Amino acid sequence: SDERSKAWPNIKASRQDIELSTRLNVESYLHTLKAIVPGMIKRRKGHVVLMGSLAGLYPQMSTVYGGQKGAIHRIAQSLRIELSGSRVKVSEICPGRTKTNFGKAAFTDKNKAKKFMSGFTLLEPRDIADAIMFALSVRWRSNISTIEISGTEQSPGGVPIIPDKDPILS
C-alpha cells in the first residue's frame, strides 16, 4: 500500500486526518497565543516559544504536515512584528527528527515508523530543551527568532544526507 502516514499525509490524506492535524498543529497554537499573549503585553514582559519544524522551513514529502509547520513559522514571524515594542519576545524552535513518539503516532505502518526513526542518530528531547533554554537565556535586548536544529547526519531540512535511507523518499 502507498499509504504513507497519518501525520505526514500527502494528497492522499483523508479529510479527517487533515482536519485533526490542522487543529493540533495550527489552531491549538492560535488559541493558546490568544489566551497568553494579552497578559504578557499588559505586564510588558514575556517570551513566546513556538515549536516549529524543519519540515515547515524546507520542502519535503510532507505536504500537509510541512504546510502546517510552515504556518507556525509564519505565525511566529508575524507575531514578532505584531508584538514589536511590547517587550514580549517570540522564538521558534525548528527541530529535525527527534527521538519522540512522533514516528509511532505519525505512521499507520509500524515498519515505516521504525524505518523513519532509524538509520542515523536522532536528536534527543534534551537537545530541543537546550535550544529552548538558549533562546530564553539571552538578555532582554536580544531576541532569538528562529533556531534550526538537526542531527549531524541530516542535511538542511532534516532529510538524511543519503536519500535511500529515508523511508519517505525510498
Locations of the language-model features?
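Alpha-helical segment proximal to the catalytic Tyr-Lys
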Residues: P38, I81-S84
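A short helix-coil junction within the Rossmann-fold of NAD(P)-dependent oxidoreductases
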Residues: R4, W8, A35-R44
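C-terminal helical subdomain
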Residues: E92-I93, N111-G158, I162-D164
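Active-site loop-to-helix junction immediately N-terminal to the catalytic Tyr of the SDR YXXXK motif
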Residues: W8-P9, A13, P59-G67, S78
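Hydrophobic positions on the long internal alpha-helix
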Residues: T32-I36, I75-A76
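Active-site helix of classical SDR
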Residues: L33, Q68-K69
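Catalytic Tyr-X3-Lys loop
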Residues: I11-L30, K45, V49, I72
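Residue(s) in the substrate-gating loop at a strand-loop-helix junction
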Residues: S53
